[in-house]
Amino acid sequence: MIYDTSTDVVVSAVAALYHMAESSHTMQLSVNFKQANHLVQVMHQCSEWGQTYIMETLLFFTPQTGQEAHMLADALSRHVQVHSPTLALTASKVAMFLMNYISDMERMNALGRWIGYVLMPHMKAPPEILYTILTNVLLYIQRRPMVLRLELSHFFCTYNDPEYIKLVKLDILYQLATQSNATDVLDELQSCVTDINENIARKATHMIGRLALKWSLVADPCVAALKTIMQGRADYALQESVMVVKDILRKYPDRYGYIVTMLCDHIPSLYESPAKVSMIWILGHFCDRVEGSTDALHDYTLSFLDESSDVQLALLTATVKLFLRKPKSGGPIVQKILHQATDLVANPDVRDRGYFYMRLLTMDANMATAVVFADAAPEEALDLIQQHVLDQLILHGASLVPLLQQNQPVMMQKVRHRFMPDSPALEPSARPHASTHMHAEPSQYHTMHDTDDEAVY
């Protein structure tokens, strides 16, 4: 019936096959190249819903060669009508799927440009639709960072953007940042720091710090921007700045010592536990360079029993570092903290850490120094999602799955998992998690909840 002369019959047959394949746990729909190519050829004669069903069904076609994937992608780009966001999102999802089977970089870049051409006209869509588009774009950029080089200006925040739009735009700007455009991204982030919305300002401040970690070329202007933020009157921006400065100092320990002195002036203004943890880490790790670090850590010990467990753990490590660097002045402080941690604190993690440090300090000072002053370089891939998770999310694109990925166990109860089908043309990086069919679980089953695999770089 898919070869019928009536497009209504073709679409009805395709829709029936698609719904049966999605609802049945025994049926595995398979489309060959001849069938897929025919469906693409008649797509321009179909309604919007008909085109959507056809493109969803194309995901059941597994290219056996890169040439098949390229030919189908080329036909798709010529016959699909992308005047609506639904068609644009579905077409871009199919293009991202086919890209896994194309090894020619020039063809991949051309397909990436086409995806941008398809999606960018809808950047002025209503906020709810725009959020859906932006969420999918963020997944695409993370999966193919070297292919999807989209224009930054499309993702600059405007005054009337809702909060949820601005937040995802900031994520996209960070992912799009390169050495050549990092300065432009920093300028946009700085303008967002002054936003009246606290969540936007915090997010922008956090992204400035991440940008400094991502590209050392703009680390100096990023730190200068953070310095300006800390001199402002927004307490919440100060809390966030301290947290990102800690990570910057971990990566560039010898470059920005001057900013630690400024941080010390703001210690009384730090009231959030993560900010306190960051400040305590800085005081302990750079105790031999920071004037007044001993007094500052002593002040924190006065409220040790009233602090959260995170702050207590950070203070334990910081006082041990102080003792190893300055045994005379740090001795009384570390003895007091270890006593409180092991005898007065109810939290088992804090007690265990206290006993660990007591035993470590009695064994060998050199060993203790090697342990507590171990390489503290920050994790730079925290913003990335593993490749197999990205593939699963993208295969579910143009649906609620990418939007609700933080609540996967609930949303996936009535949605079949999708996996990358294996073939000789599939790129090697996707093969470890590939399956025999899009709905067939791989031999080594990895879901969107797994976090033990390598990230996409």
Model-derived regions, located:
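Acidic, serine/threonine-rich low-complexity intrinsically disordered linkers/hinges in large eukaryotic
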Residues: 71, 176, 271, 292-312, ...
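Extended acidic, low-complexity intrinsically disordered regions
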Residues: 51, 84-88, 92, 105, ...
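HEAT/HEAT-like alpha-solenoid repeats
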Residues: 1-2, 28-42, 67-80, 105-123, ...
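Solenoidal tandem-repeat scaffolds enriched in leucines and small polar residues
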Residues: 1-110
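Long alpha-helical HEAT/HEAT-like repeat alpha-solenoid scaffolds in very large eukaryotic proteins
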Residues: 7-14, 26-60, 127-130, 157-177, ...
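Short inter-helical turns and helix N-cap capping residues of alpha-solenoid HEAT/ARM repeat scaffolds
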Residues: 5-7, 46-47, 83-84, 125-127, ...
